[in-house]
Amino acid sequence: GGGIDLSVGATYALCQVIAMKMAITGDPVLAILVGVIIGIGVGAANGVITTFFRINSLIATLATSFVITGGAALITGGNLITNFAVTGYAAFARTQFLDVTTAAWTMIGVVIVLAIVLSRTIAGRYMYAAGSNAEASRLAGVRVQWIKLVTFALSGGAAALGGILDSSRVLSASSANGGTALTFTVLAGIVVGGTSILGGEGAVWRTVVGVLFIAIIGNGFTLLGWNPLYEQITLGVILLLAVGGDAWSRLRTG
């Protein structure tokens, strides 16, 4: 859709905090559903702010990320939420089928669905078109504002699902689990995977490759016992090179 969502890390944290608290005191299935719906709502709110109020997505989502992070911190009181008795909630990510966890199956399912939507449907083509040239798409009859709103809503829902799966796996949640570090790790994976930072170009499978590449780097630093600060520096350099490469490619192609 051509926008940048810097609130994914904050949404990730907020939704896992809400889902975890609800799972401790109530129905874990309802907790998961509510968490995902809240994520979609946050994303939709970002979409409304950026499209209908014409605020730059970078600024808008940066601002909402602070609001969301503050809200998550108020809910937790700045403390870690943990409860190893919520077995129903734990089953969401830990149950295995064919020796593969449901968390992995969920990721595979989401990837397949998004790949089909983006490459095989009219809605997917509209998303690429809106990101590539919003004005031309609008003149061609594409409802660009609604396409961008839906794209932001999907981003929020995906962030929420990721946060809930993570808290289900470790049976804990914290407002500090998201934030800038996670957001820029996500951005690095996406850009390294070949998705243009300006929109209109990319593929789901390439994004998966980019994210796996970034994850391998992170695991490598951990296994080698290297200073985490060097990992941040490395990710920053990788992100800069990837964005620079994208800009250079666009200049060459006119």
Regions of interest found by a model, annotated:
Residues 1-27, 48-55, 187-205, 237, ...:
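Single transmembrane alpha-helix segments in multi-pass membrane proteins
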Residues 113, 132, 139-146, 169, ...:
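Cytosolic-side transmembrane-helix boundaries in multi-pass membrane proteins
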Residues 65-72, 106-117, 152-163, 189-195, ...:
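Hydrophobic core segments of alpha-helical transmembrane domains in multi-pass membrane transport
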Residues 113-153:
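Membrane-helix/interface signature in polytopic inner-membrane proteins
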Residues 143-167, 184:
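Transmembrane alpha-helices
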Residues 159, 170, 174-235:
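Transmembrane alpha-helical segments in multi-pass inner-membrane proteins
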